[in-house]
UniProtKB/Swiss-Prot annotation:
Active site: H22 (proton acceptor)
Name of the featured protein: Peptidyl-tRNA hydrolase
NCBIfam families noted in UniProt: pth
Family: Belongs to the PTH family.
Organism: Pseudomonas fluorescens (strain ATCC BAA-477 / NRRL B-23932 / Pf-5)
Gene that encodes it: pth
One Gene Ontology MF term: tRNA binding
Residue(s) at site: Stabilizes the basic form of H active site to accept a proton: D95
Predominant place of localization: cytoplasm
Taxonomic classification: Bacteria, Pseudomonadati, Pseudomonadota, Gammaproteobacteria, Pseudomonadales
Subcellular locations according to the entry: Cytoplasm
Leading EC class: hydrolase
Site (Discriminates between blocked and unblocked aminoacyl-tRNA) location in chain: N12
Catalytic reactions of this protein: an N-acyl-L-alpha-aminoacyl-tRNA + H2O = an N-acyl-L-amino acid + a tRNA + H(+)
EC number: 3.1.1.29
Length: 194
């Protein structure tokens, strides 16, 4: 399968949104940058924080959009368009209401499932939904009317520790993801639970 050239971490900008459930994807990309020893730098051209590193001679770019979640596609389309990165060479990390905290799953393609960040990325990529997703479980409040406050809220410590563990599990399968070994990455990641 295709190797990844761009990893996007979704979230909302600003200190008031740091450590909220909705910023799980951004946290994942921050952890990659930390592990790689690189700084993410604000780049107005790409509407986000960007970084770059090499893995076994392969150039991999990181992006955390600094637009609000529902405009994430603006950043993804700008960077992917400039560097000629195809949708299937993109991994988007995002919070997932349909998975419990401590669970992370990889998925290729599909709809947006009501996630406004994914919805905008699909639209901005010309209705291309073939990009890969890292779904980081945050759980569900149980009632649809509570979702907005839930995702924009900070998780209790025990829940945050589970999210951190799922991010660690996902970091552990990155070498397989970089190599395009999706089946192996999925098998290893999907067998983990915090």
């Amino acid at each position: 399968m295709t190797a990844i050239k761009l990893i996007v971490g979704l979230g909302n900008p600003g200190t008031e949104y740091e450590q909220t459930r909705h910023n799980a994807g951004a946290l994942f990309v921050e952890r990659i940058a930390e592990k790689q020893g690189i700084n993410l730098v604000a780049d107005r051209k790409y509407f986000g924080l960007t970084g770059r590193f090499s893995h076994q001679g392969q150039d991999i770019r990181l992006l955390i959009p600094t637009t609000y979640m529902n405009r994430s596609g603006q950043a993804v389309a700008a960077l992917a368009g400039f560097f000629r990165i195809k949708p299937e060479e993109i991994l988007v990390a995002h919070d997932e209401l349909d998975l419990p905290p401590g669970v992370a799953k990889l998925k290729t393609g599909g709809g947006h499932g009501g996630h406004n960040g994914l919805r905008d990325i699909i639209a901005q990529l010309g209705n291309q939904n073939t990009f890969h997703r890292l779904r980081l479980g945050i759980g569900h409040p149980g009632v649809a009317s509570m979702v907005s406050n839930f995702v924009l809220g900070r998780a209790p410590r025990a829940e945050q520790e589970k999210l951190d563990a799922s991010i660690d599990f996902a970091l552990g399968v990155l070498p397989d993801i970089f190599a395009g070994e999706w089946n192996r990455a999925m098998k290893n990641l999907h067998s983990q639970k915090a």
